[in-house]
Amino acid sequence: EDLPRGWGDEQAPGSYRLRRRDDGALFGFAAGAQSAKPVFFPTDQLLWRGRRTRGGRGLEVDPATGPGADADRGGPPYAVLGVRSCDLGAVGIHDTVLTGRGVGDVHYAQARQEAFIVAVACSDPGGTCFCGSMGTGPAPEAGKGARFDLSLTEVLEGGHGFVVDVGTQRG
């Protein structure tokens, strides 16, 4: 009910148009401009809390939020529905940068570890899409880009249905 059944889009440089589809597709639109990154790496996040010491010349960091404290995003884990393979490729790069090389962002790592990702294959890529040239699509592949728990390919011929690929044990 909350998914855009029967809607598609037309994307071209400098142009974006919604269009009605006759097939009732739930995912019949191309990847939008907003990626999955803000789900895992928000623009506003509490990292630590502190207060001035008596006399106002120093800073006392709350041990529950300071360096070495366990990451706490302050909310439940996310389930992300409709992540496209190009976004999985980008999240895979974020994973390397933000969790690799021995130094990482514990908050990002926790969000990624807890998230349940349902990827969706692009059946109608936009005119501005470049997943084919980057080797990231149009369908998600296990081991390429970021991990996904489930991947859906929408099938409209012979009735509306989905082919489901399992990417992880949780899926």
Regions found by a protein language model. Give the residues of each.
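Iron-sulfur-associated redox domains of electron-transfer enzymes in respiratory
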Residues: 1-171
